[in-house]
Each structure stands twice: as structure tokens, then as C-alpha cells.
Design a protein with these regions (language model features):
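Nuclease catalytic cores that cleave nucleic-acid phosphodiester bonds
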Residues: 2-168
Length: 168
């Protein structure tokens, strides 16, 4: 059975993910460190809370062993997205962008280059402020993922959720 895992550390769409998953009777696991207040979700049917010790990537390393092919992961973390894709999960950002295995290596390379640049004293731009359009896009893409089910199994490729190239 598909499960929706939410990297709930500062996730702006936790409630949306729970509502969409519950509407399809899909269980949800919220994973966050102890500094996040997840008590508001305690006791909700179909919602499990996994709180981990504070620490860099501790939520990621607690989540990955629990992932199964076909699960859906909600995260804005490219590293966690790569690990989830390697376990044949579908991965969506809180802004509604699906991470794809075909390009995750390039995204990791960009992330690494930006980290090196910052360590050397350089500056990089952060993400733009979260907008209502981001939330709507997230809802649409997650709803599509849950409606279509997930594709699992060796060599399976999930259906694309991006529009692909535009024809003129």
C-alpha cells in the first residue's frame, strides 16, 4: 500500500498532504525533529508522527529505511529526494514540482556547487517566498499522483506530471 511521507521540518503543505491522502484513505507519516510542533496532528486517523532527535539530516535518515517502492515523499530537500528516488518512490516538492530520476544527478551537482561557493564566502539566492500558487500546484500534482496510484517495480518509470516540451 502506498504511504505519503512528509519531511515535516518547516513544510508549508503538511495539512494539504494530510487532507489529500486521507481523502483517498492513504496513510501519512510525518517525520520531523523534536523542535517541530506536530502535536496538532496527534491522534488523527491515518496519520503517524515520527519525531527524531535534532541534528543535520536526522529526519532524512529516519525516513529512508521506511520507504517502499511506490510511496510518495514530500520534501524540498534534493538529497532526500535522491535517496527516495533510488528506492523507487515518487517525490514532490512543497511547491508542486515532481523530482525525476532522469535529472536528480544534475540537481545534486548544482546543490554541491552552490554549497562550495557559499563555503568560499560567495552568496547564492534562496528560494522565492512561498505563494498561494505554489500550494495550489502542490495540491494538483499530489492529487494526480494519488489518483493515478504509483508505479513500482524494477525499472518502472512513474508517469510524468510536468507538461513536457511545448509544441509551437
Amino acid at each position: 500500500m502506498t504511504t505519503v511521507f512528509v519531511d515535516a521540518d518547516a513544510c508549508p503543505v503538511t495539512r494539504d498532504a494530510i487532507a489529500l491522502a486521507r481523502s483517498r484513505s492513504v496513510p501519512v507519516v510525518l517525520v520531523a525533529n523534536h523542535s517541530q510542533n506536530l502535536a496538532q496532528y496527534a491522534g488523527r486517523s491515518g496519520v503517524e508522527i515520527l519525531q527524531v532527535a535534532s541534528g543535520r539530516d536526522s529526519a532524512d535518515f529516519a525516513m529512508v529505511p521506511r520507504l517502499s517502492p511506490g510511496d510518495v515523499v514530500v520534501t524540498g530537500d534534493t538529497g532526500l529526494a535522491a535517496m527516495a528516488l533510488s528506492r523507487r518512490c515518487r517525490v514532490i516538492s512543497p511547491r508542486g514540482r515532481e523530482y525525476l530520476a532522469a535529472v536528480i544527478d544534475a540537481e545534486l551537482a548544482v546543490r554541491h556547487a552552490e554549497q562550495r561557493h557559499r563555503r568560499a564566502g560567495g552568496r547564492t539566492t534562496g528560494p522565492s517566498p512561498f505563494q498561494p500558487e505554489d500550494r495550489e500546484r502542490f495540491r494538483e500534482v499530489l492529487a494526480r499522483m494519488l489518483a493515478a496510484g504509483t508505479v513500482a517495480g524494477p525499472g518502472a518509470t512513474p508517469p510524468r506530471t510536468d507538461p513536457g516540451p511545448l509544441n509551437s
